[in-house]
Amino acid sequence: MPQSSRYSDQRVEQLLSELVNVLESQHAPTDLSLMVLGNMVTNLINTSVAPTQRSMIARSFADALQASIREDKAH
């Protein structure tokens, strides 16, 4: 079931496009991009989420990420 969001699809897509543009302009390979994005998520959780909620938020994020990965062989 799709998750509802308080943010518009347009806002999400615009931010995603800007982040992708930064990574592409830096010619960042996939492994570096994943490392940087992972560090960004960690930083956001550690600086913006109450300590008592961090583990739950990280687990929820990881579960959502895993659920969004396609299992087809194309990439």
Swiss-Prot record:
Pfam families: DUF1414 (PF07208). Transmembrane segments: none annotated. It comes from the Bacteria. InterPro entries: UPF0352, YejL_sf. Belongs to the UPF0352 family. This is UPF0352 protein NT01EI_2610. It comes from Edwardsiella ictaluri (strain 93-146).
